[in-house]
A protein has these predicted regions:
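A noncatalytic interaction/capping subdomain that flanks phosphate/NTP-handling catalytic cores
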Residues: 1-107, 118-386
Length: 386
């Protein structure tokens, strides 16, 4: 009698065979035998994901029960489904698996979830899920060199003869990806645990080109920007996105944060105050002008700013308070030209910058007033000024 590893407890009966925790090499071989992918010239398994080449946030539902009803932020992303409908869908899936081979893996689900416990921060993931579009070995050597045997590559076009990946070809999708184990990155911190964070970095991508590339936030401002979650959806991250779309995604990841936002904001504020953690907002978006005219923030400058923040090199430098966005901007940062730190200075037309900055600040104001009218006044006042 074959081992089923307790799958019958979730109703999964009569599998043809169960393969559990098999090696990447074995799984790659099975995928090739099943015609599910091909090998690149570096030995990576390259597959196509069909018509779904990005997240499908409209397909998320939560079973609505009395025990969770009052804690969920019900909206067009967190949509309720009855227990009866859930059980019907589950039965359909279980029926599909009858007499089929099952590939079982013991691990956590989720690509980028992490946690903060009283003992410190920790990662749930055991690898990286990197974007590959326009991948350049000079600018991103770690990702480029990680695409080898044991790596799963999605929707990247291969040369028919050489099987060499063409990372600049987006005819399948802009959202080309590579998933690889964490130990493929030479400087990865393992086992994915750290102490209490002394610095928190919020990443945003401003397609308007007006937010500073790095700014320091007070506790209240950190809670404001955490709840607001301003960024831009960039090409390929979701179906149908071909150019950046400015968006306010609650908590910088509304599709992944099902609880009411004030719960998460309160948790963050408590930890910032308890541990005296510094918080910075880093803009990886556009500089010099909006998308289409300006340029994307150079990755080397972003890395230099984050390194300086983490190393405490921004603790004692002079700061300038930006009255429009209500944040403190460092005047100097190692490895970054001073002009880059001041977004207004990067625009040729300063009047155009002022007009755009006022427009973006008004967007912040209207979004917060509409979505979070009951937030504490000190958090509301920590946002941009109209």
């Amino acid at each position: 009698m074959q081992q089923t590893y307790g799958l019958e407890r979730i109703g999964l009966m009569n599998p043809k065979v169960v393969y559990r925790n098999m090696s990447p090499a074995w799984l790659t071989e099975q995928a090739l035998l099943n015609g599910e992918g091909v090998l690149s010239d570096t030995g990576a398994l390259v597959v196509r994901t069909g018509k779904y080449t990005g997240r499908a946030p409209d397909d998320k539902f939560i079973v609505d029960t009395p025990s969770i009803h009052d804690y969920i932020a019900w909206n067009n992303i967190n949509r309720p489904i009855s227990k009866e409908k859930f059980n019907a869908l589950k039965s359909k899936i279980l029926a599909y698996f009858q007499n089929r081979p099952i590939y079982l893996f013991d691990g956590f689900a989720g690509a980028d979830e992490h946690g903060w416990s009283p003992r410190g921060i920790f990662n749930f993931e055991g690898g990286c899920y990197a974007k590959c579009i326009n991948l350049n070995p000079e600018k991103e050597p770690y990702i480029y060199n990680a695409i080898k045997a044991g790596t799963l590559v999605e929707n990247v076009v291969l040369d028919e003869d050489t099987r060499h990946p063409n990372y600049f070809d987006s005819k399948i999708t802009e959202n080309t990806r590579a998933g690889y184990p964490i130990d493929y990155i030479p400087n990865a911190a393992q086992p994915g645990k750290g102490g209490i964070p002394t610095v928190i970095i919020f990443l945003t991508a401003d397609s308007f080109g007006v937010l500073p590339p790095i700014s320091r936030l007070s506790k209240e401002a950190a809670m404001y920007h955490f709840v607001t979650g301003f960024t831009s959806k960039v090409a390929g991250t979701e179906q149908g996105i071909t150019e950046p779309i400015p968006t306010f995604s609650t908590l910088f990841g509304e599709p992944f944060m099902p609880l009411a936002p004030d719960i998460y904001a309160g948790m963050l504020g408590e930890r910032i105050e308890k541990y005296n953690t510094k918080v910075y907002l880093v803009n990886t978006g556009w500089t010099g002008s909006p998308y289409g005219i300006g340029s994307r923030m150079d990755l080397k400058y972003t890395r230099a700013m984050i390194t300086a923040a983490l190393n405490g090199q921004l603790d004692n430098v002079p700061y300038r308070h930006d009255m429009r966005f209500n944040v403190d901007i460092p005047q100097v940062c190692p490895g970054v030209p001073n002009q880059i730190l001041n977004p207004r200075a990067t625009w040729d037309n300063k009047k155009s910058y002022d007009i755009m900055a006022k427009k973006v600040a008004a967007m912040f104001y209207e979004n917060f007033k509409t979505k979070y009218p009951d937030m504490p006044e000190e958090i509301i006042q920590a946002g941009p000024r109209v």
